[in-house]
Amino acid sequence: MDSYNILVVEDDQDINRLLCKILEGGGYCCRPAFSGSEAVLWAEQYYYDLILLDLMLPGLTGEEFIEQMRRKKTMPIIVLSAKAGLEDRVNVLRLGADDFIPKPFDNAEVLARVEAQLRRYKQFSGGGGSAVLTHGDLTLDREGVTVTAAGKPVTVTAREFDILTLLMEHPKKVFTREQLYEQVWGGEYMGDDNTVNVHISNLRAKLAKASPAEYIKTVWGIGFKMSDL
């Protein structure tokens, strides 16, 4: 098993210790952080493959931490919080989180979701197939984990990169929300369109800042595909 480094950001020492124990039992290396400010320091000094994040933190909040990280980093961020209302979940996904686990959590589910995120992240950052995908003036580099539109760099999250990779691998195929969720998130689709819609919306907005071209087309009543060239 590859060795992955995970930053666990949780101000409750008992919960932080439990999460580290769960993850270390799965073979991961964990660094505990107990505030948003401390987490920023660790994230700037060292490389982490994934961040497990509480929202209600002293000082810098979880939401502020996500915003700060997404200015320059793309690793998966899983939010784990008691703030589990629909508005809260949609908000953190829009900010750039890749997944959300409500508290109280199930130990096995935490480990499974971490494994799924890292598996997908590893696949798109170094997976098979052509290293560079292009669609018009849109370019995606698997090895460099970069996206450019009209020659301009586009900063995307791990999940957004994964979605775009899948769409660009099959530019003629229309993907339903269920197909996108099951292939990108690696879990069973439960009929909630918000997760997929939010990530598609965020991805489109970022691409639009670099170029006015429409890259991702909505096929009404079905799903999404790459736009026709």
What are these regions (language model features)?
Residues 41, 182, 205:
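Alpha-helical residues within the helix-turn-helix
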Residues 44, 173, 189:
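Flexible coil/turn residues that form the inter-helical turn or adjacent wing/linker of helix-turn-helix
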Residues 226-228:
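Short, cationic-aromatic polyanion-contact patches
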Residues 183-188:
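Short helix-coil junctions and helix-kink-helix linkers
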Residues 1-125:
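N-terminal/domain-start alpha-helical segments
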Residues 106-119, 155-165, 177, 190-209, ...:
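DNA-recognition element of transcription regulators
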Residues 67, 131, 152-154, 182, ...:
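Pre-signature/interface helix of ABC/ABC-like ATPase nucleotide-binding domains
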Residues 4-5, 116-174, 178:
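Short, Lys/Arg-enriched segments at the junction into DNA-binding effector domains
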